[in-house]
Amino acid sequence: MIRLLALDMDGTCLNGRSRMTEETIRTIRKAADAGIIIVPTSGRPLTCLPYRMTQEKGLYRYTITSNGAQVVDLEEKKTLFRMLMKRERVVQFLRECEGLNVVRMTHIQHRYVMEGPLMEVAGRIVYGRDVDGIRRVNDMEAFVEKIHYDIEEVQVYFFSGRTRRKVAEILEGYPEFSSAFGSKYVEIFAKNTSKGTALNALASRLGIAKEEIACIGDSANDLPMFEAAGLKIAMGNAVPELKKKADIVTYSNHINGAAKAIEQYIL
């Protein structure tokens, strides 16, 4: 019997336009009404979770955000688990990136901090009504240097293979960081941060066994979450390595694959 359902957001519960359909939200609500603990498990910071989810009262109590950097109990308004990067070390890293043709972003105190007006505009286009948590700064290094908080995540966007290699070289000097490279950007977290580590911590706190956990995802950052779950469902649009680990491959996010999987395999 499934007691907890961990749901990735982008590429899973959201369609190709980064929107959640009525069918998807209705099916998630049906699972919650059946007593299943719904846990949004996202690479987004808390304040950028999908608007359709946040507007549904009583749909979920716990969140895993910033790829596992934070687990929050919204009812008690407290953080249950966190894995953060030291602010001073992030400042050093950002300083080393100075002069490179990159754009830098961070997740700080559950908010998405973007550097420069162009990235803010792009963020608002992508996130739509989910943008309450976006803040723009002109100089990321100066901003991080002034604050008094440790950092959930850093993202660096680059525009050439040469710059990508240079960023990778810089990261070699930060063994306390983990990183995940895409073709145009790298996500950087505290070492051992993952959706799986966070899900294990939450399940342990709630007394829920691995075989009582189901998860649905689409990306490589969902692989650790799969390791923590008894029932692993990959989207039809998922990366090949996730499909190989899945117990079930559902339809793509363009045709409400997550909703169909919940209806067929969990309820």
Please name every model-derived segment.
Residues 96, 100-216, 220, 225, ...:
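Conserved acidic, metal-coordinating active-site core of Asp-based
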Residues 56-59, 67, 173-175, 228-229, ...:
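Short, structured coil segments at secondary-structure junctions
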